[in-house]
Curated annotation (Swiss-Prot):
This is Phospho-N-acetylmuramoyl-pentapeptide-transferase. One of its GO terms (cellular component) is plasma membrane. GO terms for molecular function: metal ion binding; phospho-N-acetylmuramoyl-pentapeptide-transferase activity; UDP-N-acetylmuramoyl-L-alanyl-D-glutamyl-meso-2,6-diaminopimelyl-D-alanyl-D-alanine:undecaprenyl-phosphate transferase activity. It comes from the Bacteria. It catalyses: UDP-N-acetyl-alpha-D-muramoyl-L-alanyl-gamma-D-glutamyl-meso-2,6-diaminopimeloyl-D-alanyl-D-alanine + di-trans,octa-cis-undecaprenyl phosphate = di-trans,octa-cis-undecaprenyl diphospho-N-acetyl-alpha-D-muramoyl-L-alanyl-D-glutamyl-meso-2,6-diaminopimeloyl-D-alanyl-D-alanine + UMP. It comes from Chlamydia pneumoniae.
């Protein structure tokens, strides 16, 4: 173990969590300008391609020159912060590093294909899905080593229920594994869908990650809970720092590099805390965004007409004529409420 932080700074958990978030925030803001210049030199521009919602082509035409791939900024800041605040001698620290690298690598490759083709389509959905399954499977395989046993893997934290629900029988184990896969892959894709307006994904993720810090602090039965809290604190700082450049009007987009990274990390943290059911509450914005896309597809196939003017949900409101800033602010408020409900669900007695 290589201690990079004096022990007196770690005497108070809340203080050290706050410093972790501040470290990532400062790193993100400090590195933002050089990263943007580098992306511009590489010609990483966002190509607006909304073939099913023609009106959005016009609404987003001014965004065409904004550099994308800004998720690399989130990746660098998160990695640096975790290496500072987490002990190098623990398996879990390097697990988080590998996990971040996998999601950032997948998103970066997807962004590169989009830029090369100069359109809104990157990797084929089935290919991206297969890689996401592989990363999620890696997470589940690593969990027993992180926990030190398999027992926590067969438990679940249920909203508004004290303690943990144990499912040690074989059907319960299958359910736990399936739910974990859905949580990780679903959250990664849901945040990817949410990233469609300036500051939307970063802002809503800040509240969601903050909510899960409280979940981690209440998860005394989970061996890895404290390390997860540090990761989530770093995530909050990274998202707030990214808003410095991504807030309206955006100077930088996170691209799939950022959205797949943020979603995959949040989903993985929820699984590590055995809080997949709490994720549905705290991540209510992401559930609504992904749900709107699923319902839209089903409606088009079964009813031959759209349920929403355009999906995901934020584009529906944009299509109705609501200003982008108002939509983003209202989604932030909804995310704040969801985080509050999630915290209440954990504190309930």
């Amino acid at each position: 173990m290589i201690p990079l932080i004096p022990m007196f700074l770690k005497q108070s958990l809340f203080f050290s969590l706050a410093l972790t978030g501040m470290t990532t925030l400062v790193l993100t803001v400090s590195l933002g300008v050089p990263v943007m210049k580098w992306l511009k030199r590489k010609n990483y521009r966002d190509y607006i391609h909304k073939e099913y919602c023609e009106k959005l082509e016009m609404l987003h035409k001014d965004k065409a020159e904004v550099p994308t791939g800004g998720g690399v900024l989130l990746f660098i800041s998160l990695i640096a912060s975790l290496l500072v605040w987490l002990p190098w001698g623990k398996f879990s620290t390097w697990f988080f590093i590998i996990l971040l690298t996998c999601y950032a690598g997948l998103g970066w490759y997807d962004d590169r294909i989009k830029i090369k083709r100069k359109q809104g389509h990157g990797l084929k959905a089935k290919h991206k899905f297969m890689v996401q399954i592989a990363i999620a499977a890696f997470t589940l395989i690593a969990l027993p080593y992180i926990y030190g046993s398999t027992e926590p893997l067969w438990t679940l934290k249920i909203p508004f229920m004290e303690g943990m629900l144990s499912l040690p029988f074989w059907l319960g184990k299958v359910f736990c594994l399936g739910l974990a896969l859905v949580a990780i892959i679903g959250t990664s894709n849901a945040v990817n869908l949410t990233d469609g307006l300036d500051g939307l994904a970063a802002g809503t993720m800040s509240f969601a990650a903050l909510g899960f810090i409280f979940v981690a602090l209440r998860s005394s039965t989970i061996p890895i809970a404290q390390d997860v809290a540090y990761v989530l604190a770093a995530l909050v700082g990274a998202c707030i720092g990214f808003l410095w450049y991504n807030g309206f009007p955006a100077q930088l987009f996170m691209g799939d590099t950022g959205s797949l990274l943020l979603g995959g990390l949040l989903g993985s943290c929820a699984v590590m805390l055995r809080a997949e059911c709490i994720l549905v509450v705290i991540g209510g914005v992401f559930v609504a965004e992904a749900g709107s896309v699923i319902l839209q597809v089903l409606s088009c196939r079964l009813r031959k007409k759209r349920l929403f003017l355009c999906s995901p949900l934020h584009h529906h409101y944009e299509y109705q004529g609501l200003p982008e800033t108002k939509i983003v602010m209202r989604f932030w408020i909804f995310s704040f409420v969801c985080a509050g409900l999630g915290i209440a669900a954990v504190l309930w007695r």
